């Protein structure tokens, strides 16, 4: 099964978004990029990969956000890039890496505002995966060998970081249905079923002509 579509996956912590992405990538014969986006950005920017990891989907302050977005929207020269604060460099290098990955062909991109970075691309399907809290607690407790209470605390903190990061760097709201093309509760169909549903959606969308999508 082949596709010409790039799929971005936002996800609640513990919703199995990455695992769902791996199933789709395997079925479509495409690559999945998660932490690999950080490695790619580090290699192309010359910034240490550990720095990307330390800033990965972490919130920043509103002043830095304005500085970053002004520079990104106006374009930047090599000299300007060199003089940027490290948070600024990391953000722009990651966005550039996402675009370059997308330019190489169909793939799955997990997190890191990939949907926003590629909003001008026509062959993109943006997905958000959520799940019932109880299911997420069980999953995280099992994976990390935690008590339910500690698993819940980790979920709340991780989701808060992801939400703050996304809301700062985009003009949208993390987890809000209006921010994505497709939102799915993985608790209802499981990993395999959710992956299949996304694949069916992508395949159907590719088969429908633009003029037939008018409502």
Predicted regions and their residues:
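Conserved phosphate-donor/acceptor-positioning beta-strand/loop module used by diverse small-molecule
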Residues: 120-142, 148-156
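Short beta-strand-centered segment that lines the nucleotide-binding/catalytic pocket of NTP-utilizing
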Residues: 31-42
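NTP-dependent small-molecule kinase module
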Residues: 95-99, 168-215
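Small-molecule kinase domains that catalyze NTP-dependent phosphoryl transfer to phosphate-bearing small molecules
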Residues: 57, 61-68, 72, 147-191
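Glycine-rich phosphate-binding P-loop
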Residues: 9-22
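ATP-dependent small-molecule kinase phosphotransfer cores
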Residues: 42-106
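RNA pseudouridine synthases
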Residues: 101, 114-120
């Amino acid at each position: 099964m082949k596709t010409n579509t790039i799929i971005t996956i936002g996800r609640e912590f513990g919703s199995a978004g990455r695992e769902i992405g791996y199933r789709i990538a395997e079925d479509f014969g495409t690559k999945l990029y998660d932490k690999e986006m950080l490695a790619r950005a580090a290699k192309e920017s010359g910034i240490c990969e550990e720095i990307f990891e330390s800033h990965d989907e972490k919130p920043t302050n509103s002043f830095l956000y304005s500085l970053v977005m002004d520079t990104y929207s106006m374009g930047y020269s090599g000299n300007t890039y060199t003089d940027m604060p490290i948070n600024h460099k990391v953000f722009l290098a990651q966005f550039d890496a996402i675009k370059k990955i997308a330019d190489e062909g169909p793939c799955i991109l997990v997190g890191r505002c990939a949907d926003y970075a590629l909003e001008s691309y026509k062959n993109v399907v943006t997905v958000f995966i959520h799940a019932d809290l109880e299911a997420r607690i069980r999953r995280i407790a099992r994976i990390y060998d935690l008590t339910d209470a500690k698993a819940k605390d980790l979920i709340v903190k991780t989701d808060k970081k992801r939400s703050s990061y996304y809301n700062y760097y985009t003009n949208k709201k993390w987890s809000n249905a209006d921010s994505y093309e497709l939102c799915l509760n993985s608790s209802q169909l499981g990993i395999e079923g959710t992956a299949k549903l996304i694949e069916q959606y992508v395949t159907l969308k590719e088969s429908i002509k633009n003029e037939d999508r008018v409502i």
